[in-house]
Every structure is written in structure tokens, then in C-alpha cells.
């Protein structure tokens, strides 16, 4: 082993890094493109987490500050009716999908969303000059509303996106904190599921554990866990399955500065200020927090209702939809308008206005539509490829019915001929085990596209976008030497005939320029 030893120090070579194969190294493209899209997907419900029971049914919580996570099921291309049966050899390779383009469309008008609390923990207005206070009352909570942090998030992968949040940590046994002291906190990770709350300007935390007053936050998140996408972990993921790409826009500014009620147990040191004269002890709080605001909502900065083309994913997986699954994670509170519904509380005709005769409800509605451009690819079953897939995602080989460990032949089993005959023992009442869903314990919006793929790109808006530019792009296409992208994908696009190749390259390069 080579080493360098200056003086008494010994320096060994660094530990080699385990290399992960890029999907471009073992994926062979077939130059066949399919289009798939969903119907108009609608949802409506109450903006709060309160369960309202009507005739043994529950009105779901539908808030603009929730994530929408779509789990898209694609057909198995190995059982697909292909236009050419000689495209692949089933004994030596398997077919997979690679996502080339995606468009997440949203309906409904833009509107700022307003959240608040009927009993908000605000003691003093700290942004303006406040009077001196010698004591706090028992309860001086106030009604407060605000337009929260504005954000749009779009993430695409073949596994669920990962979110992070802070929560209470288990204290050390030898150093258990006293009652009323600040607990230790830790960062935890979890899959972002459909219906999880976004950060709206108050941080990503488990407010079920950290909001004991139930008055420090808007009602929307007062008893929820707010997740923030863990971009650091997903970009460093070796396989690159959780996030092919992401787009986001966040904006927030401080609208008000308040101080909360409560006993401040972490007072600033006396060396930082001079005490007031006399024996009177002032109770001016030293804890401040901001009321966020998302400001203007405009169509100029919308991430949705436009196509995204994947020429090079950020990770080692360049858009391959393993297990024929895609996860689309959407967060958007720019369409946060709520419908205020008033109904009379009885059947009597109304002749004059009386507030006591009306019931007031609020509903929030959302509208989505997904569209994809998929390319047919094949994976050659070489030892290197099988070993790499077994290490990164073993479920791929299980779904392909590839067993790396042959069954043991030394065990003698009994097989009865007439197993259904009364003269033979009862057959084992054990049904064949079905493949387990690794995400069965998680909540997603299930989308089935197994019977909705089409080769006729010109019959769909996203497909026509690829085909509509016919004779205007020759002089606009950039040269390969000026850009960095996978060699296989470049050669693939050079083999695609006609305008499909032209438009894919043009749109991808224009997004990167």
C-alpha cells in the first residue's frame, strides 16, 4: 500500500467511494414516445382540521397550505401492446419508462389565502413604541389574521419526496430536564404525504408537541406538523430516485412584529441593559416573533400550467420510472381563496336581515390535471446492472421476477396428485402472498394511467407542443459542444426523426440558457 510519512505522521490513501451507476450507462432508448394525462381532478373540503360530521360522513380538510402528492401508476411495458414485437428480447432485457416531459396544470383563479386564530397569543405590538407594562394578565389573547408566506413547489421522482421538521427529542437519562424547562429538539425526516402541511412562515416543526398554548400559531397549523422539503438530502441521494428535478418559488416579508404572553425564562443578561430606577420590576418581554405576509399574488411567477422537459436529471437516475411509478409533489397557496357559504338556519322566509338566522361555512376547492411524455427504454440484464439494481432498489428485480438466489434443491417436498379428493388431506389454506406495497402506510392521491397512454401525440395539448414547431427551429438549435448533457440522450435525440427531436432539444436548451 502506498503511503506518505512526513516525520511521525502517517497518511493513508482515502477510503474509496462506492460508485453508483448512472442510468445512462445501462439504459437503451427505443425512440418510442407515449403521452399520458389525467382527467380534471377536483377536491373540496373544510379549511380547518375540525371534523364536521354530516350523516355519518366527515368533511375532509382541504387547505391551500397542504401538499398534494400524486402517486401515478404506469402500465408495465413488459406486458404492453408494443407496435413492434422485435423491440426487445425478454430473456436478456426488460422494458422501462423514462419521463421526458411533465406538465402540472392548475385551475381556479389566483387569490391570497388568509389564516388566523380567534385567540391568538399576542401581548404587545413590538414594531411601534409600546408603553411600559408592570404585569401580565391571565388571558389577553386577541383575534388576529394574516396572509401567510407565499410559495409554490413542484417535485418529480419515482419515490416519495422527503421532508424535514423539528420536534421534541428524548432527553438523556442522566440529565433529565426539570418540569417547565425547554425540551431538547431534534431534526426528523419523513415522506411528504398528501395532505401534509407546508411551512407558512412559522418554521418546519411538529407543533403538536411544541405549541402547548394552542394559541401561538394560526388554526391551520396549530395542531399539525409542518414539513419543508429536504433539498439537501434529496440532491445528495445516491440513487437520485426521490427527486429528478424541482422548481420552487418562496416569498415572504415581515408585516407585524409582536411579543407573546408567557413567563420569559431566558431573560437577557443584566450586563446588556440598565435597570429602570426604583424598585418597580418591569415585565417587558424579550421574545419577539413576526407575522408573515406573502404579498402580491400574480401570474408572472407561476410555476404551473407550463411544460418541463427533462434532458438531464439532477441525480444518477435520469428520469427512469422504476416500478412503473411516478410521484408528483405539489405545493401551491397562490390559489388560496375560500368560499364563504351562508345558509338560513330554518325554512322560514326572510323579510329582514338578522345575523342570528344565518349559518356560515367555509370551503376551499382545488383543481389539478397532470400530463406526461414518456419514452420507452430497455435495461440489459448484465451482472453489473443486476447487482447495481439489487443494491439500490431490490423491489425492481422482484417485480421483474428475477431471483438472485436459486431455490434450495436438497429439500424433498411432498406433492399430492388428487389434492381436492376426500381421500387426501385438506389443502393448505394459505393463499399465495401478494407483493407488499412499500408505501401502504402512507397517504397519496392515487392516479391510474395504466390504460391512458397513447402514441398519438398530436391528439393532446402537451404532445402538440412537441410537434407544433415544424420549420422554425433549424437556425435556433444550439450546437452540442456548447452544452453538457448525457451522450446517450444526445445521440437518441439525433436519431429521432422530424420535429420531435428538434423541439425537445430546443426547449431543454432554452430552459438551461
UniProtKB/Swiss-Prot annotation:
The keyword Disulfide bond applies. The keyword Disulfide bond applies. It is found in: Virion; Host nucleus. GO terms for biological process: endocytosis involved in viral entry into host cell; virion attachment to host cell. The gene is L1. It comes from the Viruses. GO terms for cellular component: host cell nucleus; T=7 icosahedral viral capsid. HAMAP family: PPV_L1. Gene3D superfamilies: Major capsid L1 (late) superfamily, Papillomavirus. This is Major capsid protein L1. Belongs to the papillomaviridae L1 protein family. Self-assembles into homopentamers. The capsid has an icosahedral symmetry and consists of 72 capsomers, with each capsomer being a pentamer of L1. Interacts with the minor capsid protein L2; this interaction is necessary for viral genome encapsidation. Interacts with protein E2; this interaction enhances E2-dependent replication and transcription activation. GO terms for molecular function: structural molecule activity. Keywords: Capsid protein, Disulfide bond, Host nucleus, Host-virus interaction, Late protein, T=7 icosahedral capsid protein, Viral attachment to host cell, Viral penetration into host cytoplasm, Virion, Virus endocytosis by host, Virus entry into host cell. Forms an icosahedral capsid with a T=7 symmetry and a 50 nm diameter. The capsid is composed of 72 pentamers linked to each other by disulfide bonds and associated with L2 proteins. Binds to heparan sulfate proteoglycans on cell surface of basal layer keratinocytes to provide initial virion attachment. This binding mediates a conformational change in the virus capsid that facilitates efficient infection. The virion enters the host cell via endocytosis. During virus trafficking, L1 protein dissociates from the viral DNA and the genomic DNA is released to the host nucleus. Its main location: virion.
